[in-house]
Amino acid sequence: MESTFSSPAEAALQREAGVPGLFTPPEDLDRVYELERVTKFVCDLGCQRVALQFPDQLLGDAGAVAVRLEEVTGSKMFILGDTAYGSCCVDVLGAEQAGAEALVHFGPACLSPPASLLPITFVLGQRSVALELCAKAFEARNPDPTAPVVLLSEPACAHALEALATLLRPKYQDLLISSPALPLPVGSPSSQPEPLERFGRRFPLSPGRCLEEYGAFYVGGSQASSDPVLDPDLSRLLLGWTPGRPFISCCPDTGQTQDQGVQAGRLRARRLYLIERARDAHVVGLLAGTLGVAQHREALAHLRKLTEAAGKRSYVLALGRPTPAKLANFPEMDIFVLLACPLGALAPQPSGGFFRPILTPCELEAACNPAWPPPGLAPHLTHYAELLPGSPFYVPLPPPESELWDTPDVSLISGDLRPPPSWKSSSDTGCSALTPRPQLELAESSPAASFLSSRSWQGLEPRLGQTPVKEAVQGRRGIAIAYEDEGSG
């Protein structure tokens, strides 16, 4: 039975991976998993212990890949197949517990910078792409040969973008090819200008050009599941792409295309709704998601400062993977904010849903920072690192005397007038002394006390002075599942 506070330990062992036996033919292992490149990575580092991280859908090949690498490199391989939170993030903690000197991540990845300096390489996979069908679909959707278009893809199809561009370049002059933002080798030459990095991808823009000028042609997904809600990577692109610019998705197997403009509008509309919910909230639960991504401590401190500045109370909850059963134990929270990688924060919610909405840090920033967005720029960000100092999108909080804090606002959900937030120091107790009448009567206003008084059950009744005083006696011994006086029956 699932615990309401933590996932059972047996869940990882009893979960069906869905891929029995060998998934890839032995003769294709070298090509699919890029074993030659992985071998060079291990040999160049001289590692003796290497961790291999596989998602559930690739566990059928994990044993064969590990054996092949051990034979070629002579190093000891450890398979990490029980990632507790999200397989798209690098499991640095698991690799360190195994004593690994390097880590190889297989499968889809968010490509977020890890929190550790452990050497890491990524194998995104190589999904087959029908280049001729995709090229014809591109020409049908882009009749203007001078229109600026950027080629995007899911990580497993990135290997085919250059070949697709070769088929299109004789006709289209303004093509931009994106590539996964993989970690660059140490000491690699940097003679060319550094490309723009966004959405886990690199965009080699020409001088004077910006990404907002381009439309998008995305190769990925499938005909059966074209809903971007089911694909966090596509949702990230749709949220962040410039509104009004075309965004076309293409199935790599059939070449069937779909205009994602309507889906992008739905995602942005939901984000605006969540921002309104955050503005109405008084108590915020900060969910500490994956701890293997860089700057998660700085982001957590930033979110706490943000909620304090907006006059809201925040509580940090470390619950692992969020589930409706876990979060239902905290009815005091008005909203939850998930601090995770972009793919983890935009992952689809389980069936049944949560009783309180789960937001991303970017939505909380838009709700609590009155200076957001910066003038002339309204990006739909998806990664919390873009909110921190050093990012081009960082917007500092206005000073306490700024008029931005005194601007009245009306809730678009309830229709009530929201009072202007007040800047509260960390030493504030959360209660305000009010003197509404000259009788000098003292009244305390506390959000926590107001919520407690509205609950149907407020805890055990103290009954002070109503029960006799007794000497303390020994109570029951054992644990809740089996006390000593209950026997084994």
Swiss-Prot record:
Keywords: Acetylation, Iron, Iron-sulfur, Metal-binding, Phosphoprotein. The modification Phosphothreonine is found at residues 435, 467. Disulfide bonds: none annotated. The modification N-acetylmethionine is found at residue 1. Pathway: Protein modification; peptidyl-diphthamide biosynthesis. InterPro entries: DHP2, DPH1/DPH2, DPH1/DPH2_1, DPH1/DPH2_3. It holds the Pfam family Diphthamide_syn. [4Fe-4S] cluster binds at residues 89, 110, 341. Component of the 2-(3-amino-3-carboxypropyl)histidine synthase complex composed of DPH1, DPH2, DPH3 and a NADH-dependent reductase. Interacts with DPH1. The keyword Acetylation applies. Binds 1 [4Fe-4S] cluster per subunit. The cluster facilitates the reduction of the catalytic iron-sulfur cluster in the DPH1 subunit. Gene3D superfamilies: Diphthamide synthesis DPH1/DPH2 domain 1 (3.40.50.11840), Diphthamide synthesis DPH1/DPH2 domain 3 (3.40.50.11860). Belongs to the DPH1/DPH2 family. DPH2 subfamily. Coiled coil: none annotated. This is 2-(3-amino-3-carboxypropyl)histidine synthase subunit 2. GO terms for cellular component: 2-(3-amino-3-carboxypropyl)histidine synthase complex. Required for the first step of diphthamide biosynthesis, a post-translational modification of histidine which occurs in elongation factor 2. DPH1 and DPH2 transfer a 3-amino-3-carboxypropyl (ACP) group from S-adenosyl-L-methionine (SAM) to a histidine residue, the reaction is assisted by a reduction system comprising DPH3 and a NADH-dependent reductase. Facilitates the reduction of the catalytic iron-sulfur cluster found in the DPH1 subunit.
